[in-house]
Amino acid sequence: DAAHCTYGEVYEINCARYGREADLPISLFKQALDDAVTGKVTGPEAVLDLRLKAFSDIAQNHVTENIFSHYMYKTLPTGSHLWTFKRQLTHQHALSCFVSALLRLGGRTPQKIMCAKNTGRVFMLDFHPAFDSKGITEFVEPVPFRLTRNLYTFFTPFGVRGDFVVAMAAAAQAMSAPGANIETQMMLFYRDQLMVWPWRRMSGAGPQALLGPTPADVRVMARANVDEVM
């Protein structure tokens, strides 16, 4: 669909426009960490400094913070369209970030976040949690949600501190309001996700993984995940 694109596709279009290799930043990052892999650089602080230096170099020279902004400036026909799109996208992304943080959903890479260029709506691909062998959500993200430099630049500081924060706070207030019944909704969500989770592929799930958890086990796991969220 020409009206939809992922953030990853926006980056690839920018690379094609300026004749850059899309995978070059990954290669450069790996090369920068060769000293850590070979043991020339040891210690957590030294490795962290090496990673930070590599990230700063790539962010400054290869993946700048205005890629998404330039794409939307070239795509939308007028300033009115741009203003409406920017505000709608800010609200939509704030809600997506809130749900991601609430349900402990990680892996929000640019290829898994899609937006509609004609409406500003945000769609998440592969929007489901990952579970360990005990059925508890695995969340190893270093940040609670995805707000990259490119999105921050496009939203502007005023948009982030205004529409983005307000939309996220309004969603949190609605979830915690009396009568929201959020626990029941989350129980249903985790129950459905646990029932379709590929238990056979879990290395530490034990011999019962071939059969999968029983309905009683699923209820216990879902309850544990809801308690973790709440």
Predicted feature locations:
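Catalytic-loop of the protein kinase fold
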Residues: 103-110
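Structured secondary-structure scaffolds
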Residues: 98-99
